[in-house]
A protein has these predicted regions:
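Solvent-exposed helix/loop surface patches that form functional interfaces
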Residues: 88-192
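Acidic, serine/threonine-rich low-complexity disordered tracts
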Residues: 1-83, 146-259
């Protein structure tokens, strides 16, 4: 039976409009992940912490970036209950997180005040109103949207799954993609598909490769989404990989299959 898993990941995501020369921004951080199987519940507990947050390769400097970074960091550590197929079911320390976020917001409100800041805090409070809304907000984050997803169950030839990318191609917009899960070999799984044609003039693709270790543990996730509309091309790229020697031998796939 699965005992535990520990890993340290470094993630970097890059947002590009038309080309890197036109507009490009990057976000990076370290994610510290611990997981254990709970036999009596037949699910898993994940504890996630975050450090070394960088915007365009540097710590946040602008006031709004600093506020968003600190409010984002108040989410951690986060304790998740996760289903056997890797979907997030519950946030076990929700009340603790809500108190941290409120304290962070109160501290900044006492120091700075602006209409933009008020809008941001209203949005943040709405996202953390209850466990369900906070889980939904987690899936707006690249790491959670890719990591907590059933990648070990292949799709059939006529089957497609849905992934939604929020704040893409632009802030306060979202796009959905239908994709298939195809194992390429023993340690590579590809998720690929196309944008849902809700808006006919939008075109786009989703392509991501997961690389796993000997035990099936996730070692690397590398991929991108693209969208094109009215001659403008938007792209988001990401790379998530473990730091050398920082993942347990008992692996992630074993955690899923050893039910």
């Amino acid at each position: 039976m699965f005992g535990s898993m520990q890993a340290v990941y470094r993630i970097e995501s890059k947002y590009i409009i038309d080309s890197e020369e036109n507009y490009c921004s990057t976000f990076g951080s370290k994610l510290h992940v611990t997981a254990r199987y709970e036999k009596e519940r037949d699910n898993y507990t994940f504890i996630i912490n975050r450090s070394a947050v960088l915007l365009n390769g540097k710590p946040a400097v602008k006031l709004m970036d600093r506020i968003m970074s600190e409010v984002g960091n108040s989410l951690y550590p986060i304790h998740l209950r996760v289903s056997p197929r890797l979907w997030i079911l519950d946030i076990l320390n929700f009340n603790e997180i809500k108190q941290r976020r409120q304290q962070c917001a109160d501290d900044w409100k006492a120091e700075a005040d602006s209409p933009e800041l008020e809008r941001y805090f209203r949005f943040s409070e709405k996202n953390s109103a209850n466990g369900k809304t906070l889980i939904a907000s987690l899936y707006r984050d690249t790491f959670f949207n890719l990591y907590f997803r059933d990648i070990f169950t292949p799709t059939g030839n006529d089957e497609a799954r849905l992934i939604r990318w929020q704040n893409f191609p632009e802030r306060e917009t979202d796009q959905s993609y239908l994709y298939q899960v195809k194992p390429e070999d023993a340690d590579r799984i590809r998720l690929s598909g196309e944008i849902m044609k809700i808006v006919p003039e939008h075109n786009g693709t989703f392509d991501t490769v997961y690389e796993t270790g000997d035990q099936g543990e996730i070692r690397r996730i590398k991929g991108r989404i693209e969208s094109e509309s009215e001659g403008t091309r938007y792209m988001k790229q990401w790379t998530l990989e473990t730091e050398t020697g920082q993942i347990a031998k008992q692996g992630y796939k074993s955690l899923i299959l050893n039910e």
